[in-house]
Amino acid sequence: MMETNSIQKELLLTSYLFEYPSKEWWGDVKECAAAAHTVARPQSREVLEEFFDYVEESDPKEYEDAYVRAFDFSQNTNLYLTTHNRTDFGKQSEELLAYKQLFLDAGYDLDHELPDYLPAILELAAAVPEKRAAHILAAVRPKLELLRDRLIEAKLPYAFLLDVVLTGAAHLEGRTAS
């Protein structure tokens, strides 16, 4: 894992935890769990440590099944942010273009993923300077809040990860609001 500031680290770790738990993903769990212990902000560190404990204590197949039920089989809690509350596909297309522009403005392009995929957005915010990260997270904040509310409603532990993201976003917005 690259050297980052604490909020960047939080964003990378939450991005990782929102990724599909493939065989390669499981191979990185211990390294990422160790990185969670070095997160500077105590509340974020505690949430990440507890989530990694949950992951490490889970049976991989059961964890994968729960992940798929939470994100792949649920329209309400999937990780593609423009699909929530969307019946106007023209508006969804406009949102996708706006998300794509966030990546292009930062010098990145996505070849194999849609630009509204939450882990990709979190990785992008972790890879750019704080001011741009604050802008990216502010642009997606309403969608993050909606997803968080739906995860809470569904009683899914991933809601705690969005708490980490949203408090990190608020912190970045406060630091860059000059």
Predicted feature locations:
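Charged, alpha-helix-forming regions
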Residues: 1-110, 114-116, 123-178
